[in-house]
Amino acid sequence: MPTATLARLASDYLRQGQRLVARLDDAAYASPLPALSRSSVGAHLRHVMEHFTSLLDGAPTGIVDYDLRARDALLENNRSAAITALHSIERALAQDSMRRDCELLVLVDSGECGMRTRSRSSLQRELQFCIAHTVHHY
């Protein structure tokens, strides 16, 4: 699938998140739920948004590091902040630079051994990852 199509698809999924947030009250957004392994809708949505933000921040430099997420509690507890962030991510995905494939280097924490692995990737592949990750968390 072309990179531009993936960017549009990612925006479609983020708009689904916006619609969900708009339908929830503050307590429903931020409260832990047994069905979400004692996590909240807000925590899952923050996690999704921060993966997209990592990609958007790293793409211009050619280096993406998903482990450097901000883990911003405001996004998981404040619906207004989440909606603002979702709109911002959607606008960034619409930029021309996010519609043309390019090579990326993705840094990954390899786990217990403390090593960081560098993997060659592309904007197209990382958009696919972020979309699949979003579907998983929705």
Language model segments and positions:
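Amphipathic alpha-helix face/heptad-repeat signature
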Residues: L6-Y13, V41, N78-A85, C130-H133
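Alpha-helical bundle segments that constitute or directly flank the non-heme di-iron/ferroxidase center
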Residues: M1-D26, G42-P60
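Short, contiguous alpha-helical
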Residues: A30-L68, G114-Y138
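Charge-rich alpha-helical segments
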Residues: A7-L14, L24, R38, I83, ...
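Residue-level recognition of alpha-helical structural elements
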Residues: T3-L6, L33, S37, L75-N78, ...
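Short, helix-capping/interhelical loops that line the mouth of catalytic, cofactor-
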Residues: P2-A4, E50-Q95, R99-R116
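Terminal, compositionally biased segments
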Residues: M1-A4, R8, D12, R19, ...
